[in-house]
């Protein structure tokens, strides 16, 4: 509701761009797409960006899209390259949209893994920030660079520690390896 109010209350000359790359991972019912504002015909420029890189697992194909009103879409059409997405990317993305059962499965597995990893990190006295995505931001009770280095020694790569660590969730067996190493590091 807060985000929606900010969009509605902004001046008409301000273009709002919302990146909903991770929205498909969200399980919190209070989080929702701003697409409804475009459907309602909001009288302010709004662009919603989506990607096939996250829940669809198609990062290598570099496929995404924007949803906006007809006036903004016309501006995009005049300034974009007609060949900015490969044929394979287009066909694969189109096919992926038809398999919502797979998207639902990925979302459910991600939520289970996110909850499991979060609980373990908290049990190891890490400060864990609530997440609705496929990654977890945490601060270990020891130097984050040490955590990063110890994980790297065992071929587990996480986001570079700039005050905190960021671990992307993977397949359950990859997450188990991360948990096992974290227990060794912090025990």
Predicted segment positions?
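Conserved PLP phosphate-binding loop immediately N-terminal to the Schiff-base lysine helix
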Residues: 3, 14-35
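Short, small-residue-biased leader/transition segments that mark boundaries at the very start
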Residues: 1-7
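Short loop segments at secondary-structure junctions
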Residues: 9, 68-72, 99, 140-143, ...
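Conserved PLP-binding catalytic core of the aspartate aminotransferase-like
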Residues: 110-111, 120-154, 169
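Nucleotide-activated donor-binding/catalytic signature segment of Leloir-type glycosyltransferases, i.e.
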Residues: 34-46
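PLP-dependent aminotransferase class I/II
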Residues: 45-122, 126-129
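PLP-dependent enzyme catalytic core of the Aspartate aminotransferase-like
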Residues: 150-187
């Amino acid at each position: 509701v807060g985000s929606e109010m900010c969009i509605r209350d902004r001046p008409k000359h301000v273009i709002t761009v919302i990146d909903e790359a991770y929205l498909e991972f969200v399980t919190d019912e209070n989080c929702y797409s701003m697409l409804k504002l475009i459907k309602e015909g909001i009288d302010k420029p709004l662009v919603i960006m989506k990607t096939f890189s996250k829940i669809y697992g198609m990062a290598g194909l570099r496929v995404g899209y924007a949803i906006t009103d007809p006036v903004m879409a016309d501006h995009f059409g005049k300034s974009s390259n007609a060949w900015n997405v490969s044929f394979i990317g287009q066909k694969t993305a189109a096919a992926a949209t038809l398999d919502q059962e797979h998207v639902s499965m990925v979302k459910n597995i991600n939520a289970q893994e996110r909850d499991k990893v979060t609980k373990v990190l908290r049990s190891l006295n890490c400060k864990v920030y609530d997440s609705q995505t496929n990654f977890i931001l945490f601060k270990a009770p020891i130097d984050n660079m040490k955590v990063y280095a110890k994980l790297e020694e065992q071929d587990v790569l996480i986001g570079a520690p700039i005050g905190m660590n960021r671990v992307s969730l993977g397949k359950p067996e990859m997450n188990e390896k991360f948990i096992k190493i974290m227990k060794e590091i912090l025990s």
